[in-house]
């Protein structure tokens, strides 16, 4: 999908949303989901973290999702709120629900221009934090991708 079509799709989704938060804060993170938008927006945990982070005065969370099958572009992955490439954020926080999303996590990072494997990332690239339901069942596979794994 060309970049302008992706931007149009994102703006259409934002126009249909209720409760979108656009904030400016001293600290920002990209709140990422390793599946497409409709799957992420069905996750109460993902929405709760979005509200909790944005409820703080000193933090702002912007959302990013694995593009739909036809939504991948050479331009990478940007956040919905400011259209900032996720590779420009200091931290990427992922909610990973189950093992099948590990492939989506690797694809997301690759499409975003961030090395998927932890040991391949440089110090000037985003810190990758993983949490979500998978951490309760089997957090070990996340270690290949995450700099930090948070239970929950």
Model feature map: region roles:
Residues 12, 51, 55, 107, ...:
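Charged/polar, solvent-exposed surface patches and flexible loops
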Residues 1-25, 73-78:
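Short N-terminal or domain-adjacent regulatory/targeting segments
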Residues 66-152:
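Glycine-rich beta-alpha loop elements in corrinoid/cobalamin-binding modules
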Residues 26-28, 125:
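A structure-centric signal for secondary-structure junctions around beta-strands
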Residues 56-57, 112:
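Residues at alpha-helix termini
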Residues 38-39, 101:
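Eukaryotic short linear interaction motifs
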Residues 29-34, 40-51, 58-67, 73-78, ...:
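Low-complexity, highly charged intrinsically disordered N-terminal segments
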């Amino acid at each position: 999908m060309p970049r302008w079509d992706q931007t149009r799709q994102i703006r259409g989704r934002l126009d249909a949303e209720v409760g979108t938060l656009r904030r400016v804060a001293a600290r920002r993170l990209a709140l990422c989901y390793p599946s497409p938008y409709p799957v992420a927006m069905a996750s109460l945990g993902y929405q709760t973290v979005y509200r909790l982070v944005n409820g703080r005065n000193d933090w702002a969370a912007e959302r990013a999702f694995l593009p739909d099958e036809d939504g991948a572009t050479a331009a990478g992955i940007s956040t919905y709120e400011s259209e900032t490439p996720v590779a420009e954020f200091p931290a990427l926080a992922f909610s990973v629900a189950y093992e099948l999303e590990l492939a989506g996590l690797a694809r997301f990072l690759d499409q975003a221009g961030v090395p998927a494997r932890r040991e391949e990332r440089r110090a000037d690239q985003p810190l990758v934090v993983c949490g979500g339901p998978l951490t309760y069942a089997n957090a070990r596979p996340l270690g290949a991708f995450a700099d930090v794994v948070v239970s929950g």
